[in-house]
């Protein structure tokens, strides 16, 4: 196999969910050069996988808002040339959207993707040379691995392997990361529940760390810090630095957000609080200790999270 070009551009959780497929491909084709096309904001994540030889950042989100700028079209032209220079034997689009399928079409190599019945945007399947049927009721990780296996001629192993190497610890502190921010209000947990869980974690000797990604989340972090003894607000860090904080945590508790899946990838003890989405399709999966509480239209209390935490082997 000369080379394999993966297209999985976004979002953060989707990028993490693609990593086991990369591991599978490398295991079955160890001599192939693996290249990954990913949205520029998530390029640091793609580079974390040791089997990836090259990352090609794409900037579709930014380009759409700047189509009248000459520099945008120069960037698009340079991106197309970069795609062609990859010279992959197989091009695999696990994103399954029209925009990702158009990227596949611009690349050189045999283009693989989902068939019209297996894809969110059926028109996207028109752009592929080879179309594969993959059940839509499977978890995203399984769908990525299945499509990749069908494209490359193997059946994935039962075990999930994200392929990531844990970054070294810089100190011996024990802390729990609380991911309270998410993309929709319907997926948010009440602050009183975060406070209840945070106070219990403090009583167990864990420092509570509060990340944030926007002004609304920063203000919530301030309120939680004021109510949870010994807690601290995490500085806003680059994505690769945030990864180090997650990978070396003793525990992660979070609502349905992309960063949650990094904890699963690094096998950090994890409690996922789901409120408005189905964890069976996009919830955290991995080989570490994972507990999912709640579910679509199910609201778990902080006592339920404490009960789950008491059963987990917290990292030291």
Task: Annotate the PLM regions.
Residues 1-316:
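Catalytic machinery of carbohydrate-active enzymes
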């Amino acid at each position: 196999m000369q080379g394999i070009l993966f297209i999985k551009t976004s979002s953060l959780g989707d990028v993490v969910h693609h990593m086991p497929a990369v591991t599978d491909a490398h295991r079955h084709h160890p001599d192939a050069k693996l290249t990954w096309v990913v949205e520029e904001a998530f390029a640091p994540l793609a580079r974390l996988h040791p089997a990836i030889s090259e990352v090609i950042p794409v900037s579709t989100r930014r380009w759409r808002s700047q189509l009248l700028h000459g520099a945008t079209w120069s960037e698009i032209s340079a991106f197309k040339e970069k795609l062609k220079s990859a010279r992959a034997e197989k091009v695999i689009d696990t994103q399954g959207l029209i925009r990702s399928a158009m990227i596949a079409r611009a690349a050189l190599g045999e283009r693989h993707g989902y068939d019209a019945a297996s894809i969110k945007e059926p028109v996207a399947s028109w752009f592929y040379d080879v179309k594969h049927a993959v059940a839509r009721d499977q978890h995203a990780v399984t769908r990525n691995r299945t499509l990749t296996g069908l494209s490359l001629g193997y059946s994935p192993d039962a075990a999930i392997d994200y392929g990531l190497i844990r970054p070294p610890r810089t100190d011996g502190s024990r802390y729990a990361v609380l991911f309270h921010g998410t993309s929709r209000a319907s997926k948010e947990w009440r602050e009183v529940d975060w406070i209840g869980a945070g106070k219990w974690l403090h009583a167990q000797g864990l420092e509570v760390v509060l990340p944030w990604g926007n002004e609304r989340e920063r203000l919530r972090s301030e309120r939680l810090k004021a109510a949870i003894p010994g807690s601290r607000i995490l500085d806003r860090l680059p994505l690769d630095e945030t990864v180090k904080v997650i990978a070396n945590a003793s525990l992660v508790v979070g609502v349905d957000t992309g960063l949650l899946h990094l904890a699963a990838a690094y096998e950090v003890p994890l409690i996922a609080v789901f409120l408005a989405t189905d964890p069976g399709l996009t919830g955290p999966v991995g080989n570490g200790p994972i507990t999912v509480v709640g579910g679509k239209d199910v609201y778990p209390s902080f006592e339920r999270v404490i009960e789950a935490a008491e059963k987990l082997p917290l990292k030291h």
